[in-house]
Amino acid sequence: GYTENEKISIAKGYLIPRQIRENGLRPDEVTFSDESLQTIIRSYTREAGVRGLERKIGAICRKAGTRIAEGEGKKFSITSELVEEFLEHPIYFGPEELNERTSLPGIVPGLAYTSFGGDILFIEATRMPGGRGFQVTGSIGNVMQESARAALSYVRSRAESLGLPEGFFEKNDIHLHIPSGATPKDGPSAGVTMATALVSLVSGRKVKPHLGMTGEITLRGQVLPIGGVKEKVLAANRNGLRTVILPKRNQFDLEDVPDEIKKSMKFIYVETVDDVLNAALEKPKLTNKKKTNAKKPVKSPKKGKSNDKGHVGGR
């Protein structure tokens, strides 16, 4: 996958000249600012490569060419505003969308690796009255099914030490869902995300903003290394995540990530699920304990008379 700066350089050096040429325009008739290219990359494409970026650039060139042919202008300097005018409503909404989707307990963004590069994978957990029922949906494969069951078993086995409500799993059914149901998903690297989503749901603690994670887990709560670290980190950066939780044994895989990306993000290396939960979830809210109004002992009045109601006894 390419970084955002690499995509801008490729667009200026190759994609824009080619689309201008293929659409019968002169180089001075349509120009793109870096800001406009950034808008296309962030709001209209979400990919590791540049194919979608070139298609959007081509669409803008065609619309600009049509306006030039109709006499509505001689030259177009493409800005972010013109991008939105030519391409209409943005497809993706960046960090704001992520924060909105994770504003409730039980929803956690994970990092996935696909044939198209890295991507964000949301894990959603909900509960229903019942008892011990568990289902996972979202077009997932056998390995991910097993990861989900391992995550549930770990959380149930640690319920007391995690401070989860007593008897919760005996009284509720659990449903895990991974959206984009038409896209097949598989692999073990969503284990930490599933475990975190379950604890978040049961405890009511939301995931911290701008945070993503990846890692396989064991029944004993160990976090194992995974693949596709570079692609996952690039996807996190593309989507506005500022913090990424990684297995400690993947630490050296960051050598493949460009320095500009590493400097702009925070990485937390974990060995256990407890490490993940401490880093990912908001601190539990302390319940306001009712203050006991202990009665102060009343001093026995001294001998003597006093007409002052504010004092007992003498001066």
Where are these regions (language model features)?
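Conserved C-terminal "switch" segment of AAA+ ATPases
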Residues: 1-58, 63-76, 158-167, 205-208
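Residue-level marker of structural boundaries
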Residues: 16-17, 62, 92, 263, ...
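A glycine-rich phosphate-binding loop feature that marks nucleotide/adenosyl-phosphate handling sites
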Residues: 33-37, 60, 77-83, 170-179, ...
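Glycine/threonine-rich ATP-lid/beta-loop region of ATP-binding domains
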Residues: 47-111
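Peripheral, non-AAA+ core regions of ATP-driven protein-machinery
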Residues: 96, 104-109, 117-315
